[in-house]
């Protein structure tokens, strides 16, 4: 075999680079044309839909809701989701598909939730608000909720007379395809254009990125990479990311009730939700009592050796989160970790002692599993400090909870902890995204405000899918005097 000359190597390298560039350009051109076709069909459907009155729009929203609330549909979607993603628990996904969709429908059918034409008139200020669509919505959805999240976003988008194109996760694509079939069946019944709701023809990163560029509005729920892609797409967006819920149990809490609620939150759907409790910070006077109550609820407290085994099962070699234990049944986690104690094998969830915050203790972050990190705080001051540090590490702006009977403590944590949701004596996984026993909007996408680098600091709702025209009419002129506005300042500091 002859030795290649430098010229030969350079030429072949240049040709290879050129071929790669051509292939990339071809893929981008294909993505551009594929998305352009989807968007064109969406706009044509919107051309019909924008003439619907509020009653017909609400009927379309009901159609989408029924596509997933219908029990046999909810069950088949849940079965397929667990089968294809390997994440979560079938029974809980059925409940999530139905409960979240029913709650969202309740919000959207509220007589005050107007989204067509004139939605508000303020006679005193002479302002009339007229609701209009934002346009074609690109919705990137996660594998953890491959049916409930796209259905939720579709209901909200259609409430505003928009069209929506869904970019599912690779593992959730088949579930999304089935959901789309169910939705189209219901849209046909009410005579609505089917192209109001579409999905990418196949899962492809370039298609998803091109969709975010060509759409009028982007909403992303999922991984940090997808959220960043949405935020940097150049398109107006509502993109939300990681949670890492911390629940504080103070010395005044109803212990048994708090333990039941934390267990329910921790174990639901095997921890797929960003709203499940990841850590609990317990005041020292009730620490032992609370841990025992959590054990009675099915929790298993790992000793130091078992903690090491569990950490290796979640983060092999201290690296990337292992898919083997992600959103899996506790029996699977026990098997992977090599936990031999029969009580561990039968546990509903696992507890580990919190030994630090940040990279020094990976258990202080979001785990997406039935593992709860338990911290002891000497007093409420220390509990707040710990909570703040944990959320600063992961989950800034998202949410936390407090189990208490002290209104003074409620006010303190509300003032001192920078989150957009603070739930008092609630099941975090149900309450964060709206519940029938609280006043938050039902959603599966929760903004964390500027703390989280998000554009929204509330639960995603239909209002985020509206543009508002504000018609301003003249009103009687009232010009304040300088004395009225500056008098208090002058009296204190002079002119």
Regions found by a protein language model. Give the residues of each.
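N-terminal Rossmann-like NAD(P)+-binding subdomain of aldehyde/semialdehyde dehydrogenases
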Residues: 2-127, 156, 296
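ALDH superfamily catalytic-core signature
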Residues: 21, 29, 151, 227-358, ...
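Conserved C-terminal structural/oligomerization subdomain of aldehyde/semialdehyde dehydrogenase
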Residues: 27, 50, 339-495
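Short, flexible turn/loop "capping" segments at secondary-structure junctions
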Residues: 38-40, 239-241, 270-274, 361-368, ...
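Structural signal for hydrophobic packing residues in well-ordered secondary-structure cores
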Residues: 43-46, 50-53, 61-72, 81, ...
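Flexible, glycine/charged-enriched surface loops at secondary-structure junctions
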Residues: 51-59, 76-78, 193-197, 270-273, ...
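Rossmann-like NAD(P) dinucleotide-binding subdomain of oxidoreductase/dehydrogenase enzymes
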Residues: 116-257
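Short beta-alpha connecting loops at secondary-structure transitions
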Residues: 167-168, 244-248, 278, 446-452
């Amino acid at each position: 075999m002859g030795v290649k000359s430098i010229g030969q190597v350079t030429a072949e390298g240049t040709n290879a680079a050129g071929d790669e560039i051509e292939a990339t350009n071809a893929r981008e051109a294909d993505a551009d044309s594929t998305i352009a076709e989807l968007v064109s069909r969406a706009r044509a459907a919107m051309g019909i839909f924008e003439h619907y009155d509020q009653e017909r729009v609400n009927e379309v929203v009901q159609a989408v809701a029924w596509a997933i609330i219908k029990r046999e549909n909810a069950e088949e979607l849940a079965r397929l989701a667990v089968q294809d993603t390997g994440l979560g628990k079938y029974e809980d996904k059925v409940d999530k598909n139905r409960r979240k969709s029913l709650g969202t429908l309740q919000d959207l059918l509220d007589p005050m939730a107007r989204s067509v034409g004139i939605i508000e008139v303020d006679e005193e200020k002479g302002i009339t608000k007229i609701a209009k669509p934002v346009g074609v919505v690109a919705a990137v959805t996660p594998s953890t909720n491959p049916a409930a999240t796209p259905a939720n976003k579709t209901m909200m988008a259609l409430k505003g007379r928009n069209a929506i194109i869904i970019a599912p996760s690779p593992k959730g694509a088949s579930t999304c395809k089935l959901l789309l079939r169910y939705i189209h069946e219901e849209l046909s019944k009410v005579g609505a254009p089917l192209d109001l709701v579409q999905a990418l023809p196949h899962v492809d990163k370039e298609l998803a990125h091109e969709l975010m560029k060509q759409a009028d509005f982007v909403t992303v729920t999922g991984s940090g990479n997808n959220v960043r892609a949405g935020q940097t797409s150049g398109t107006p967006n509502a993109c939300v990311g990681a949670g890492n819920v911390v629940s504080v149990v103070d010395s005044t809490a109803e212990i048994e009730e708090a333990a039941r609620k934390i267990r329910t939150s921790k174990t639901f759907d095997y921890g797929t939700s960003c709203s499940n409790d990841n850590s609990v910070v317990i005041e020292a006077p009730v620490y032992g009592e609370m841990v025992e109550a959590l054990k009675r609820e099915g929790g298993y407290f790992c000793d130091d050796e078992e903690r090491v085994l569990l950490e290796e099962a979640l983060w092999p070699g201290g690296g990337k989160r292992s898919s083997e234990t992600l959103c899996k049944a506790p029996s699977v986690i026990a098997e992977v970790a090599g936990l031999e104690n029969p009580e561990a094998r039968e546990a509903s969830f696992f507890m580990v002692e919190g030994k630090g915050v940040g990279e020094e203790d990976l258990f202080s972050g979001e785990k997406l599993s039935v593992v709860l990190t338990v911290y002891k705080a000497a007093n409420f001051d220390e509990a707040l400090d710990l909570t703040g540090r944990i959320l600063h590490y992961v989950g800034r702006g998202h949410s936390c909870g407090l189990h208490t009977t002290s209104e003074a403590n409620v006010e303190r944590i509300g003032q001192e902890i920078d989150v957009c949701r603070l739930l008092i004596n609630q099941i975090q996984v149900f309450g964060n995204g709206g519940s029938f026993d609280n006043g938050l909007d039902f959603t599966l996408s929760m903004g964390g405000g500027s703390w989280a680098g998000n554009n929204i600091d509330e639960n995603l709702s239909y209002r985020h899918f509206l543009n508002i025209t504000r018609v301003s009419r003249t009103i009687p002129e009232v010009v304040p005097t300088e004395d009225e506005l500056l008098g208090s300042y002058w009296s204190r500091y002079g002119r």
